Each structure stands twice: as structure tokens, then as C-alpha cells.
């Protein structure tokens, strides 16, 4: 996977956590059988910045843990390159994930698992949204997404 990791925090995200995000997302991409040249980005921000995204794009004026911006989303969207014309030579950008580093530690502590498990959870959660999964559509969709999310994290080794 061609993954851009952007750190917009003041304190900086450790090299270890950059590598973890890259590794877990490559693992998730393999689980979904995505082409190796799939492109996406993960941007680390603070609470103020993610609140701005949440307010401007979702109409919710408070911080959140992760926001996903899929390139192709919903029934009204169309493929820029048709599925028939798609080749391994053409990279497909699936979108962007924004993660609040301020929330990762607090949620990990509250839920009783490691910072790494929470970080993995959030990026896999966002990644699944970029790939068309949506837990907000109903009980069946929620179960499908959360089961796949848990399976990916467990198989990777980030268990609760």
C-alpha cells in the first residue's frame, strides 16, 4: 500500500507508532485483498484540529477520535476509472483518515487496553470506512464492520 503518514501535532508521533500504522494498514489491505498500489493517507492532529474538521464537514462542533474521507462514497459517486478499465498499473486512492492523538491515550485508558491497540483500532476503523463499510447503516452493517475490524486486529496481534 502506498501510505502517506502526516504528523500535524506539536509533540510529534513516534517512529514506532508511524511504523505500527503502516504495518497494520498493510495487513488490513491484504485482508481485504486490495491491490498493493492502493493509496491513502493518515494524518495525526490534535483535538482542536479534529474538532474543526468535525464541525466543518460533519456539522458536529466537538472533537472526535477519527474521521474518514473516502474518495468514492455512496451511491451518487462514480468511479473515475471504470472497474473494467482498472489495471494493477493504475494506483487507486481510497481517501484520507484524520486521527486525534489527544483522544487515543484517554480512550485506551478508559477501555483498559494499550495505546497501540487503540491506535490500531482507530486506523482500521477509518480504513474500513474508506473501503465502503459503514456501521451507521443498520445492525447488520454494524455487525459486519465490527466483526471484520476485530478479526483484522486480533489476527494482527492487537487484541483487547
From Swiss-Prot:
Its biological purpose: Single strand-specific metallo-endoribonuclease involved in late-stage 70S ribosome quality control and in maturation of the 3' terminus of the 16S rRNA.
Location within or outside the cell: Cytoplasm
GO molecular function, one term: zinc ion binding
Cofactor section: Zn(2+)
Enzyme type, top EC level: hydrolase
Family designation: Belongs to the endoribonuclease YbeY family.
Protein name in the entry: Endoribonuclease YbeY
Gene3D superfamilies named in the record: Metalloproteases ('zincins'), catalytic domain
One Pfam family from the record: YbeY
Residue sites binding Zn(2+) per the record: 125, 129, 135
Example GO biological process: rRNA processing
Enzyme Commission number(s) of this protein: 3.1.-.-
Entry note: cofactor: Binds 1 zinc ion.
Entries under NCBIfam families matching the protein: rRNA maturation RNase YbeY
Cellular component per GO, a single term: cytoplasm
Species assigned in the record: Leuconostoc citreum (strain KM20)
Keywords: Cytoplasm, Endonuclease, Hydrolase, Metal-binding, Nuclease, Ribosome biogenesis, rRNA processing, Zinc
PANTHER family: ENDORIBONUCLEASE YBEY, CHLOROPLASTIC
